[in-house]
Structures are given as structure tokens and as C-alpha cells.
């Protein structure tokens, strides 16, 4: 089995208690079978403490308090389980987050999800073109090679710096046999606002596109940040294009383009409202998009259906 990951992957470090959007708050964390067995066998008072924090079910999950905080999260925003027993005691999701995986025949690709603010900051701060690295054990089967070659054509277009961002996106769509319904950013914002929000403030963020937006002014200043949108476009292609083993390729390519275009539009809306939009604000927009769209199976399904 070959495992590949973006070159920046190894630079990721969790910011733990310093994180403003703690992944132990607001998320119902499922517990894998092996971890559940391990927690059930923990001895002593701490074992009782852990078991009291687990809600039985299929699968079981950690309880959330009235503020949406995991029952194992301390007041200093560090995990009591990890601090007491070490990282090896964490369940799979807690140990793995914000990593995602794309599984192909003979190949697994690993990346960092943008719902994590540190992963988003790391991605948007990169100016180098994205390359994949890892351990290649043997050549993948032909069907995987064909999918990878197809995706590489789209990645090459996404990173063709002779073209504007818009030119790259317009090139990707026909290469993928895809098209976007002709709608304004305001109309697309209304569509995404009709889906279930996962975080407070998301609907209000989308609503900014219902007001007049100075795209011309944003285009002039955002030229200096074009690599940020290139990184986003590449990220969405890597994460989603082959996520279903090559099914729904046109819709998934269109989703990558639409996601990048919407983040550009949301940046323009933020600048119109405030007169400026900082790097930190652009990171937060990427995180919000990821948390409210990518990390909801229902919302992803609705978006892909809309693009099919």
C-alpha cells in the first residue's frame, strides 16, 4: 500500500489549548471499538471518570455538557484523558483529527482538513506549489493510475501561474467535463444558507453576499494573495475529486471550483463591510466553509446533487 501526503503535512502541529476553535467543543466525538474496550477496562477512580464521560450507543461517543464541551475537556482546554494517560489513550478520531484520508486501490492519500484553524493557517501561508510525497511500496493498479493522471491535469491547471485564478478555474471545468450552474455569488450563498449550519455565525457570514460587494476593489488588492486561492483550489481537488473512488468526477471538480470561488466572494464581502480583510480573517473564512460544508455529510451530498 502506498501512502502519500502534501509536502506541508509534516509541518502541522496541534496548538492544543491555544486553539480558538477547539475541536473538543461542539462536536460529538464517536469512539471506535478498540478504544471503547480499553476505556471499559480502565481501573480505579479515573476509569470510572472516563466511563461516566461516555454515552453508550452504536457507536458510543463522549458526552457534551450544556456548553457543548466534551466531558473530558479541562477548563484549560486540554484533554484530561491525554494529560493523564498519554496520546496513545485517545480514540481514533481524537488522535487523527484534523487528518482526512482518500482511499484508492493500492493507494491512500492523507491530508489536513481546513475545519482546523491551524491547518487552514498552514495551508494559506504556503507559497510553494503543492507536491505529494510519501512511501511508494509498489505501482498502483491501472484504474488508480488513470484517475491520478486525470487529477494531475486538473492540478496542473490549478497551479498554472501564467493564468489568473479565474482563468485556471475556467480551464479546470471543461477538462473535468464539468460545468457550474450560472448563478451569482449571492444566489449560491442563499443555497448554502438553506442547508443546516454547524456553527453559529455561518448563516450571517453568507448573508453578507446579499448586500452590495465591491469585487473590483477586492480584485485589485487580492492579487497579492492569489497563491492563497491557488492553495485552496488544490486542496479541494485533492480532498474531494477522488474521494468516492472516481465516481461523480465532474460534480466533485465543480465543487472544488465553486468552493474556491465562494471563499473569494466571501473575502470580497468582508472587505466591503470592514474596509479590509486580514490574513487571519481569510483563514477563518476557509475554516468556516470547511466546518459547515465539508464536515457535514448531508451538506456535501446536497452540494454535489446541486452540481450534478
Mark where each language-model region is.
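Short, Gly/Pro- and small/polar-rich lid/capping loops
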Residues: 1-4
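Polybasic, low-complexity association/targeting segments
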Residues: 8-59
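Short, compositionally biased low-complexity segments
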Residues: 11-18, 127-132, 232-235
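Local cysteine-cluster metal-coordination motifs and their immediate loop/turn environment
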Residues: 11-29, 65-100, 113-120
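Short, charged/polar micro-motifs that form catalytic or ligand-binding hotspots
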Residues: 14, 84, 144, 249-253
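Gly/Pro-rich turn-and-neighbor structural signature
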Residues: 47-77
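Internal, well-ordered alpha/beta segment that forms a basic, Gly-enriched binding/recognition surface
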Residues: 77, 85-163
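Hydrophobic, aromatic-lined core segments that form the binding pocket/scaffold
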Residues: 151, 155-308
